[in-house]
Design a protein with these regions (language model features):
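Phosphate- and other anionic-substrate recognition elements at nucleic-acid/protein interfaces
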Residues: 1-148
Length: 148
């Protein structure tokens, strides 16, 4: 399972063979987050949660606090359900896709590159690969390939 936290993120679940079980935009409320994760067996699920570590540069303190609260809801739901969770910095999982460095691209160009890579890896999803779900899919594949 790969989780790109934040309101504009997503969650993707792959089986051990890499088939997509579920791919969706980030649930809106803490209860919806809990219900999403509740569908999965804690003994058979590993979640890689992107460790952003801080708010986005230029965001207000209230936006940063909102992001931190949302991230806390994700962590608490995973903890409450006993789902093994591994945090991973974006630079680490992004490196495995050989796209270069995010710092060398405009944010919109970098997101487009990530979306294209997810579309290449998961062509069967078609339009379900969006800017909201592409990172989650790539994080889930990173999780699967590194046997987290």
């Amino acid at each position: 399972m790969g989780v790109d936290p934040g309101a504009s993120g997503g969650i993707a679940v792959l089986d051990e063979d890499g088939a997509v079980v579920e791919c969706s935009n980030m649930p809106d409320t803490p209860m919806e987050i809990l219900e999403f994760f509740r569908k999965y067996d804690a003994n058979e699920t590993v979640c890689v949660l992107e460790d952003v570590g801080q708010g986005m540069p230029g965001q207000s303190s209230s936006a940063t606090a909102k992001f931190a609260r949302h991230n806390g809801h994700l962590e608490m739901a995973l903890l409450a359900l006993g789902i093994k969770t591994v945090k991973c910095r974006p630079q680490k999982w992004e490196k495995t896709y050989a796209l270069g460095s995010s710092g060398k691209h405009e944010k919109s160009e970098w997101k487009r590159m990530l979306k294209e890579r997810a579309q290449q890896l998961f062509p069967q999803l078609g339009k379900k690969v969006t800017l909201k779900t592409c990172d989650a899919l790539l994080i889930a594949e990173y999780c699967r390939k590194t046997n987290r």
